[in-house]
Design a protein with these regions (language model features):
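Bacterial N-terminal signal peptides
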Residues: 12-23
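Extracytoplasmic soluble-region selector
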Residues: 2-4, 8, 23-176
């Protein structure tokens, strides 16, 4: 009986020691991952994306460079409305981040006097429309822009998510 007690005690000490050794010898670093995997941005803005715990070089790329571009340091630039994926590639694995850019179907608009164009919001719904100068161009609640007289102005829209997006409007002088 006494022999069994010593054996159990010895076994318990060995298990506890082994468990402590495992805890302290393991790395405390987390797994490699992107700082974000889903991002919603407004056209014209930028944001830094990070690949955490990455070892070695990281190669960044965009699935659609017309919507979102990315530089070699992981800074992403929202160019126009749409959806694209940013990829961060290491030697071992590729990581993806979905980027949704809220914007208009046109970022700049040139309209002749009395002409109309319908601006459409991509990846959101319009809540309220504004014209920077109603003497140059007006906008309806449906996003229809009408050129009034020559000049430059900005048409803005507040989306349902609270984002403000803008379109520059130019109405040229008509030469007779």
């Amino acid at each position: 009986m006494r022999r069994h007690k010593k054996l159990y005690t010895l076994l318990t000490v060995l298990v506890v020691t082994f468990t402590m050794f495992l805890q302290f010898s393991c790395s405390s670093e987390g797994a490699t991952r992107l700082s974000e995997t889903n991002i919603v941005m407004t056209a014209g803005t930028n944001k830094k994306l990070k690949l955490r715990q990455a070892k070695g070089a990281v190669k960044w790329s965009s699935s659609n460079k017309n919507i979102v571009s990315v530089n070699e340091k992981g800074r992403i630039y929202a160019l126009k409305g749409g959806t694209a994926y940013i990829k961060a590639r290491t030697k071992k694995k590729t990581y993806k981040c979905k980027v949704v850019v809220v914007g208009f179907n046109k970022e700049k608009l040139t309209l002749s006097k009395k002409k109309k164009f319908t601006l459409k919001v991509r990846n959101s719904k319009a809540r309220k429309w504004y014209s920077g100068n109603k003497k140059i161009a007006t906008v309806t609640s449906k996003g229809v822009v009408k050129a009034k007289k020559s000049g430059k102005t900005t048409i803005a829209c507040i989306t349902r998510t609270g984002r403000k997006i803008k379109c520059k409007v130019y109405v040229p002088k008509l030469e007779n």
